[in-house]
Amino acid sequence: MKTIVVCSGGLDSVSLAHKMAAEQQLIGLVSFDYGQRHRKELDFAARCAARLAVPHHIIDIAAIGGHLSGSALTDNVEVPDGHYAEETMKATVVPNRNAIMLAIAFGLAAAQKADAVAVAVHGGDHFIYPDCRPGFIDAFQRMQNAALDGYASVRLLAPYVDVSKAAIVADGEKHATPFAETWSCYKGGRLHCGRCGTCVERREAFHLAGISDPTDYEDRDFWKAAVSQYSAKEVR
């Protein structure tokens, strides 16, 4: 299938891009500048596209992101430290982010006669992000079937939606993903901070997968305390 990958430049979506390059006909990556404080992730998406020799489109929706106030990713709100599944991480929710991005990606796919859009939502996202859950993925596919009825048929591929980030690390290793060429940290500093939810999740995933983590963290050990102290109930 001719497939476009929504790629932020993070570990999950870059691993997905390498997976799709191996298993499907990858025809491009699409990324979004929504005014995120960790915009440097887009540089890693560009490197991924160059590495896989496919076109890379960066869609500027910063004007929209500016109206989605109250998120630590787009507003003057501190990025919390701690486990990625804790209630405090709701500060990192950008309302309707995936719905907005996927709607644009599907329009792009239809215009380019692509067969599928692939997105790297995963099981670890279910706790906090409603637009990463299986119910959302299924509902979005139904909506797009109606939106493109008679014009195009585009599938939404979410191969990681029911698996852990550790499983993504293992899959990325299988498909030769250069993990050092990915960016996760929400704070967007020179190095991964090692303390925000996505850094904790990244560090834990490599540990659980039994794969060496090449990432340079400002705080390499905080994740252990964060993981030992959290409790959260998954929502699907």
Curated annotation (Swiss-Prot):
Taxonomic superkingdom: Bacteria
Function field: Catalyzes the ATP-dependent conversion of 7-carboxy-7-deazaguanine (CDG) to 7-cyano-7-deazaguanine (preQ(0)).
One Gene Ontology molecular-function label: ATP binding
Record field: catalytic activity: 7-carboxy-7-deazaguanine + NH4(+) + ATP = 7-cyano-7-deazaguanine + ADP + phosphate + H2O + H(+)
Protein residues bound to Zn(2+): C185, C193, C196, C199
Record's signal peptide: none
Record's protein name: 7-cyano-7-deazaguanine synthase
Entry's family note: Belongs to the QueC family.
Cross-referenced Gene3D superfamilies: HUPs (3.40.50.620)
Pathway(s) the chain acts in: Purine metabolism; 7-cyano-7-deazaguanine biosynthesis
One Pfam family per UniProt: QueC
InterPro entries according to UniProt: QueC, Rossmann-like_a/b/a_fold
Cofactor(s) required, per the database record: Zn(2+)
Cofactor, free-text remark: Binds 1 zinc ion per subunit.
Species whose genome carries this gene: Rhizobium etli (strain CIAT 652)
EC number, as in UniProt: 6.3.4.20
Protein keywords: ATP-binding, Ligase, Metal-binding, Nucleotide-binding, Queuosine biosynthesis, Zinc
Keyword Nucleotide-binding: yes
